[in-house]
């Protein structure tokens, strides 16, 4: 471990890979595991029990692994698991879980920008972007390649579908369908995330299938959700993977979805 500064606190139970770089005024708490290639710039706090994979980078005043901000939490053992190659910019905060034995999970290749927050028990996928001041309350699930724009706020237990985008300053209290864009206060579904899908290499058939889902669920006001799903299941794109994913997402949504 390369200790860049002498003014730091590293607890005896911390497990730190040999090539981790730790800057001045950092705190590495009890039962923290830091994998190879991690870099902690100055004034970083990581507490445990928590584990971090390889290649993670922590900028000044980022704080990860502290106890949940939940009044019912009474000190039970909970965890934070972080994958590889994530970036936590200044003042980003990630909390451990609330329920005994629970785990907050962050996947790989995610970017958490200035002053964003992921609360207790969040389940964050891969290649996700939390823009500045974006906040996710407890138990929020965020799918791969989703983008949360600046200053948005996501209600607890909401699911954000993969390849979706939440607009700046949106108030999200219901689920966000995969491949869609929501914005507003409260958030409503505005369109298909066509540009995002194109950038990720989705086919024209995928785009057409998702656009049809959007029209059935949001444009055609004469259809109930149940009727729209039936038409999608019997459409020419019924076997398309994106369509199947949207149908399943709607069927399993517990909070309803942004209209």
Give the ranges of each region predicted by the language model:
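Single conserved hydrophobic/aromatic residue that forms the stacking wall/gate
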Residues: 1-5, 9-10, 120
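N-terminal segments that cap or nucleate solenoid repeat domains
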Residues: 6-30
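Terminal amphipathic alpha-helical/low-complexity segments used for targeting or macromolecular assembly
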Residues: 6-7, 18-19, 55, 61, ...
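Conserved short hydrophobic patches within well-ordered secondary structure
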Residues: 10-11, 111-113, 246
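Flexible, glycine/small-residue-enriched loop-and-beta-strand segment within the central core
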Residues: 21-160, 168, 176, 180, ...
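A donor-sugar binding/catalytic signature common to diverse glycosyltransferases
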Residues: 171
